[in-house]
Amino acid sequence: MTHVNLITGFLGSGKTTLLCHLLAARPAGETWAVLVNEFGEIGIDGALLADRGATLKEIPGGCLCCVNGLPMQVGLNMLLKSNPDRLLIEPTGLGHPRQVLEMLSAPVYQAWLQLNATLTLLDARQLADPRIVANENFRDQLAAADIIIANKRDCWDEEDRLRLADWQQQMQPLRPLIETEFGQIPLSLLDTPYQSRELPVPHHHHPANHASGLAALRLDGEARWRRALNHGQGYSACGWLFDADTLFDSDALLEWVRQAQVDRIKGVMRTAEGTMRINCQAKDLQSETLTSPPPDSRIEIIHSQQTDWNRLQSALLKCRLR
């Protein structure tokens, strides 16, 4: 039987970093799988989680509950066929967990999986942003939590800590809250039992151009690069995919990220020095360079305001070395 955990949290709370930490701590001899869903259509998290020792399935372009849950069911069934010891599911930061939890609790899956605790990540700084606090998905993700992971503790100031303490006092029902940084949590948390509770019914609006496929975007024919857009739930995503022959200037690329002034940027890019992984939430920019190159370059922006994508694209194209 496969043990299953839902890993939720709003945009930029550190879900992918936490997944990387958990996969690095995977016990020897165990087989793990990851089902990852993204709001955009480029498929960044799949590239970030590649080569982590787990079977990976991506569902890009919306939330797992869309299209009557068909992408979720197909992806879940494909992973369960290999009978992994554990399955970690990461829905989009703009997704609602209710339908996913209902599906995982359905009688048809009871012989195949054991649903364990839902872990919801929270950055205390998010509590200072009225737009985030008022967001339906943000509230409902926290309502679904069995354990709340207060992440990015190293970035908080005293006001953030006081705001988190005040929020925790008002939390109903009371649930464990664990403070951490870089998504570092004990592996034992995954074995915490799931607590079934009544969750709010979501009223979010799905994007009109929602993708129902089960694979991240690919290049067509002789195309060197392409762009993909997605809209919904008050946010827009714009992503770019470049072929393996395209290299980027790492300094110019990081400057482009700094100047973009958007809510979220994630990317895995080919540079002259190797693979550059980029993760930027507001003004928090993290990057690392690895020697092994990815098969292509992918970068994506998510923003809540109207954005001149053509201007950003023009500046991004100027970062290419070839």
Please identify what each model-predicted range represents.
Residues 302:
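Flexible loop/N-cap segments at domain edges
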Residues 86-181, 185:
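Phosphate/Mg2+-binding loops and adjacent switch elements
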Residues 147, 155-295, 305-310, 314-322:
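C-terminal accessory "lid"/substrate-recognition subdomains
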Residues 2-8, 13, 17-131:
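Nucleotide-state-sensitive switch-loop elements of NTP-binding domains
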